[in-house]
Amino acid sequence: MSIIQTYHTIVERLKQIVSSERITRIRTMAWLQSGMLHSRSVHLNRIASKIPGKAKKLSRVRQLERFVDNPHVRVREWYHPVAAGLLKDAAATGCVLRLIIDGSKVGNGHQLLLVSLAYRRRALPIAWTWVRCRRGHSTGPKQCALLAYIHGLVPSDAAVVVIGDSEFSPLQAVLASWNWCYVLRQKGNHLLRLAQDQLWQRCDTLLT
């Protein structure tokens, strides 16, 4: 498929998702996505090089920069129908929804907190937020706020399991209140007991 065909396909899809949005923003978003697909890059310079037309490459880059920086383009509102649709379709299969939560350092002083849906050996992004921190983990309130948004997207009758590292331990109480299961990796020297009448054991002693 040529980039022109990709562009028109994305435009029609975006018109359905954000029907009330300005057509100029829809077209710019379509070019941004088309350029990403055909350049296989997220760098605006490479994306702009794939966009056809008489405009100079630098002008294309600046147009994309203005769009990305536009405060009126609310990412979550644009992506909400997509995320809700992914969760609905996955739940309709009758399988447990496996949500992967992860934090990754991006640049200097920022961390991307991302929740994805595990589906057919792929991780499909559902929702994300940025955390300003030079080092360390995201806070419990930030984690809970992100999961609370996703909780509103998940079909009420769906079974859910959340998978993540030990930094997401603050989520345990809220996940239990939603009857969501969770698997959070723990350090080997952490202690646990399987029942009230049993002794505390190191996690690494349970591995066989």
Enumerate the language-model features and the residues they cover.
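Generic hydrophobic, aliphatic-rich segments that mediate packing or membrane embedding
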Residues: 43, 60, 83, 97-99, ...
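Short glycine-rich, polar/acidic loop-and-turn segments at beta strand-coil junctions
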Residues: 48-51, 62-63, 68, 102-105, ...
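An internal, acidic/charged active-site-proximal segment
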Residues: 130-208
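Short, conserved catalytic/metal-binding motifs centered on acidic residues
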Residues: 47, 97-104, 115, 123, ...
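Short acidic/polar alpha-helix capping motifs at helix-coil junctions
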Residues: 8-14, 113, 136-140
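Electropositive nucleic-acid engagement tracts
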Residues: 2-31, 35-94, 149
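Local beta-strand/beta-hairpin segments that build beta-sheet-rich folds
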Residues: 124-130
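Structured nucleic-acid-interacting core domains from mobile-element enzymes and related host factors
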Residues: 73-124
